[in-house]
Amino acid sequence: MERYRLSQIDHLRQDGICFDANIWLYLFCPLGNYRIHTVIAYSKCYARILEVKLPVYVDIVIVSEVINRYLRLAHSYYCKNQGIHMDYKKYRKTEDYQKILREVYSLVKKRILPHCIIGNISYDKDMFISLLDDSDYDKDFNDHHITNLCLRHNLCLMTHDSDFKHTNIPI
């Protein structure tokens, strides 16, 4: 299967691109404390994707992963700054959580969704069972779904997750 570098974005032969949650976090989550060269590389690539109008797909599973990871990072950051240990469920009752939740929802509504096509998959029972029966146990359940999304819509997956390295989709 094809493997592309960020610099090859103009050479994709697929109908569009799907960003894994980690890419959205590199682009828009300052709490991640990511390596600056990685953030810059993905930011330049994203700007080029928008410039050439390459369709970018997202779905509810990816958005859910972005939201949940962003909130978990905020929880960790909050506890570290407060010098405390706090259960995540207790954190959800804090003003900080409410502020971050509004922030991440706004991010999705204003910075992600306006530039994306929603790529849905309707699973029938047999398709759902095939997700559960897949013999590739190195990937988590959501990764199986994202692979199917890319296959269904002929998408290249942009990810920084090595779990996808042996998939049958272009990356």
Language-model segments: which ranges?
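Short, well-structured N-terminal submotif of metal-dependent ribonuclease cores
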Residues: M1-I62, N68-M86, H153
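Active-site neighborhoods of divalent-metal-dependent phosphate/nucleic-acid chemistry enzymes
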Residues: E2-R3, K99-C156
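A short, hydrophobic secondary-structure junction motif
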Residues: A21-W24, K44-Y57, E95-G119
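Positions that flank functional sites
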Residues: S64, K165
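Helix-loop junctions and short alpha-helical segments
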Residues: Y70, A74-S76, I84-R111
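Active-site regions of enzymes building and remodeling cell-envelope glycoconjugates
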Residues: T167-I171
